[in-house]
Every structure is written in C-alpha cells, then in structure tokens.
C-alpha cells in the first residue's frame, strides 16, 4: 500500500468534562499553554512540549 502524499495530522480536538464542576469543553490535544475550565478555573490540559497531559475526563475525540 502506498504512503499518502499528505499525511494526516496526529493532533485532535477533544471534548472533555471538568472533574470539579462537570462543565463540558472542547480542547486541543497538543496545547502550547495550560487550558483551564471556563467555569471554575481548574486545569484541564497541561502542555508537555508535544501531546498534552489531559487531567479531565475525555468524552469524545472529534475528527
């Protein structure tokens, strides 16, 4: 099987649920800065220089 000319990106958008307040929010899987909950301010995703550490419950991976 031939390799595609333009590879698909490995990064995704994620629908996550805050553990503290239950707010659902869409975040990027490879963030450059800390992503905080819009309601309570809890950290949802921390950057690591690549794929972020998700500290919330992942509900869905968006295409």
Curated annotation (Swiss-Prot):
Q: Could you list this entry's UniProt keywords, alphabetically sorted.
A: Metal-binding, Ribonucleoprotein, Ribosomal protein, Zinc, Zinc-finger
**GO BP, one annotated term:** translation
Which parts of the chain are coiled coil? none
Top-rank lineage group of the source organism: Archaea
The record describes how the cofactor is bound as:
Binds 1 zinc ion per subunit.
Q: What ranges of residues constitute the C4-type zinc fingers?
A: 18-40
Binding site residues for Zn(2+): 18, 21, 37, 40
A GO molecular function term, named singly, is: structural constituent of ribosome
Instruction: List the signal peptide residues.
Output: none
**Record's GO cellular component terms:** ribonucleoprotein complex; ribosome
Entries under InterPro entries matching the protein: Ribosomal_eS27, Ribosomal_eS27_Zn-bd_dom_sf, Ribosomal_zn-bd
Question: Which Pfam families does this UniProt record tie to the protein?
Answer: Ribosomal_S27e
**Cofactors that this protein relies on:** Zn(2+)
Q: Tell me the subunit arrangement.
A: Part of the 30S ribosomal subunit.
Q: Which HAMAP family match?
A: Ribosomal_eS27
Q: Which family does it belong to?
A: Belongs to the eukaryotic ribosomal protein eS27 family.
- Indicate what this protein is called per its UniProt record: Small ribosomal subunit protein eS27
Organism of origin is: Pyrococcus furiosus (strain ATCC 43587 / DSM 3638 / JCM 8422 / Vc1)
Lineage of this protein's species? Answer: Archaea, Methanobacteriati, Methanobacteriota, Thermococci, Thermococcales
């Amino acid at each position: 099987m031939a390799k595609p000319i333009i590879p698909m990106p490995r990064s995704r958008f994620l629908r996550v649920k805050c553990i503290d307040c239950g707010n659902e929010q869409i975040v990027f899987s490879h963030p450059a800065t800390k992503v905080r909950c819009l309601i309570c301010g809890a950290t949802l995703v921390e950057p690591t220089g690549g794929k972020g550490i998700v500290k919330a419950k992942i509900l869905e991976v968006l295409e």
